Amino acid sequence: MVPWVEKYRPRSLKELVNQDEAKKELAAWANEWARGSIPEPRAVLLHGPPGTGKTSAAYALAHDFGWDVIELNASDKRTRNVIEKIVGGASTSRSLLRMTREAGGDYEHVEGHSDRVLVLVDEVDGIDPREDRGGVTALTRAVRQARNPMVLVANDPWVLPKSLRDAVRMIEFRRLRVNDIVEALRRICEREGIEYEEVALRRIAKRARGDLRAAINDLEALARPTGRVTSDDVEALGWRDKEITIFEALGRIFNKPPRQARRALWNLDEDPDDVILWIAQNIPRAYRDPEEIARAYDYLSKADVFSSRAIETGDWRFKYVYATDLMTSGVAAARKGKPPGFVRFQPPKILRKLGTTRKEREVRNSIAKKIAERMHVSTRRAKMDVISVLEIAFRKVADNPTDRGLEILGGIAGYLELSKREIGFLCGDPQVAQRVYQRALRVREKLRKIRRERVKGAMESMLERKREESEVEEEAKEIEEAVEKAEEEEEREEKKKEGGGEQRTLDAFF
């Protein structure tokens, strides 16, 4: 069964998702070779994040121009002798193929119809200066003397020597956008006859973080068994937020030499204890030889012991240095034969179980919050004491659903304002849950009416009090005004009396 990543690998540069600038620059460089001239630089270095189409672009380019392809990747020895024999003095495709066989390499050969041969060196940034002694120096010399087009591929070009970077034309592949990945996933679903929800494809694309290869692997893992992919499928895999990176890390651990495998966890945002679970689950899938499996588990068990000592002693080097070295380099060193190549990795069973029960835990937490609000208890007590009692009561009625029992459950569910999903969780029977839910709706409506009437009565009572208070205020105001008026009258009368008793002078008689 061909993995979808290989099945839907682009056959032409036109099929490559996005990367318009990179495709244009790459095609212009290839056209110079096709016209019979030797461009300078003679090699290109395709660099960018994983899953952006670098290696696929090289094969698509060769297909467009009818070139054969000879690939050296990280699983091959890339010592000075091998590189010199393969690409050092190459001038024609036949001499290259002959040198490939003489070098004893197992390199992929893509049939074409041209005299040119494209030499592809993948994961150049993974060449180890100790294990592949002299490889980088020989590669730099081969690039400068190449008589055939050479394509180098790297995730991080800046770890390469400046001499090699100066000898190539660097072409950047940018991280893919979510919409680009969604469109590619949609085409695969349509070709495979997969039923899909648009939101599910978008969630897969977001989790991939610009890595189309990882997104396709994710889609295949979800859709191939059932023929469909829904948002619930993706939602249930909450523990898979870092799974794409984990896939890449596992690939390095099981396929790379120990020194390269050691770097597998450097950029992995995952707890080493979780990585141990992933490796333990997939050792039998990656290794077939019983001795290799035994050695791998032995290294892994030692890693687990060191990780535990970190907690006991507080010295975290046990976990993040010694344990990680054992679970990466150790497991890689357990392999004595050829690398397994592509492996369909599986998540740990315990994480899968947590993923499938995640929704149940969410429902239980939601019920506990409603109980805590209504009964004025803590959420913890609601979970431990109340929910278990409710489950017994609901399931007992579900086993023998009488009208009386359904009415009681409806009253409880209505009072707690439980949703149909929450009632179904307590009942365990969807049909009974529906009947209880209908009764609960009626109870909730009655409770709403009671609350509305109570609120209305309270409002009317408050308004009545305000009216009474207003009337009292008006009476008090009238009394106050009457008192003030009486006081003014009294003052005027007193003034008149005082004026009538004044003593007259002689001037008043003339």
Curated annotation (Swiss-Prot):
Question: In the record, what terms sit under GO molecular function?
Answer: ATP binding; ATP hydrolysis activity; DNA clamp loader activity
The answer to whether the entry has keyword Cell inner membrane is no
Instruction: State any GO BP term from the record.
Output: DNA replication
List the residue ranges of the region (Disordered): 459-510
Which sites bind ATP? G48, P49, P50, G51, T52, G53, K54, T55
Matching InterPro entries: AAA+_ATPase, ATPase_AAA_core, P-loop_NTPase, Rep_factor-C_lsu, RFC_lid
What UniProt keywords apply to this chain's record, in alphabetical order? ATP-binding, DNA replication, Nucleotide-binding
UniProt lists compositionally biased (Basic and acidic residues) regions at 493-510
Subunit architecture: Heteromultimer composed of small subunits (RfcS) and large subunits (RfcL).
Protein task: Part of the RFC clamp loader complex which loads the PCNA sliding clamp onto DNA.
Which family does the similarity line name? Belongs to the activator 1 small subunits family. RfcL subfamily.
This protein's name: Replication factor C large subunit
Which organism was this protein described from?
Methanopyrus kandleri (strain AV19 / DSM 6324 / JCM 9639 / NBRC 100938)
